[in-house]
Amino acid sequence: RRRGRREVLHRQDRRRAGRYHADVRCTLPGRDHPGYGESLKIMVWGCLIVGLILFLIARFSVKGKGEYGEDRIYDILQKVDGYKATLPNCYLPKGNGETAEVDLIFLHESGIYVFESKNYSGWIFGSENQKYWTQCFSDRRGGTKKYKFYNPLWQNDTHIRVLQKILRNKNVNIYSYIVFGNDCTLKDVRLSQLNYYVIQRRELLKSVLENAMYYGRVLSNEDIDNLYRMLLPYTEVSPEEKETHNRNIQEKYRM
């Protein structure tokens, strides 16, 4: 009887499943149905539109723009010839309980490149001696909107000093790169220091290649491998550590 009852229940489940699948099939026209092709096109276009909307939200949000800029820098650096290693998003300990977040460290035969990505638009004004730089926009009324942001050269100088303490070697060539997005205009950015580079992303590959050619090889393959192993753990941080870092930065650079 138990076996017979199980078989009856099993047949009932199959019938219910059959009705469910039949109901689902009825919601879409069959391949031979006159409206099948039109329905398929609507579904495909709907998926594409939703995907595009999600991409644009991610691309043009503050966080999304920052990540996009860093990803593009990473991709460009892979085109540089020679032995190399790339470390994105390094959280280097300062020794006081705080961390310095380096957008990207590029280990290459010609030295160590430390990148700060600023995927900004508008006009950019600043010099290496100013605490704050200015980003300007033209608004719809014909006026100008201005925003201040902390001197990225000073920001990257902090990153480099922390990196030098970790490496315990100040004799390695270290280059400070501030890379702005292609949608901005560097109107009045004055530099005097060597090893300082403030450029747009479209200039990055040419700049690094010229720099590598000028300085030649200063790091061996073994040097690069050792540096990579030393710094890799600083890219593996928890979400809680990232949140603590972001909170400290917001408090420190609040104007």
Kindly label every feature range from the protein language model.
Residues G37-A100, L107-I112, K118-G126, F137-M255:
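Surface-exposed interaction regions that form or flank ligand-binding interfaces
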Residues D13, D103, E116:
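Acidic active-site catalytic centers that drive phospho-/nucleotidyl reactions
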Residues H21, V102-D103:
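Short hydrophobic/charged patches on amphipathic alpha-helices used for structural packing
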Residues E128, W133:
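Polar interaction faces of repeat-based domains
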Residues R1-G37:
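P/S/T/G-enriched low-complexity
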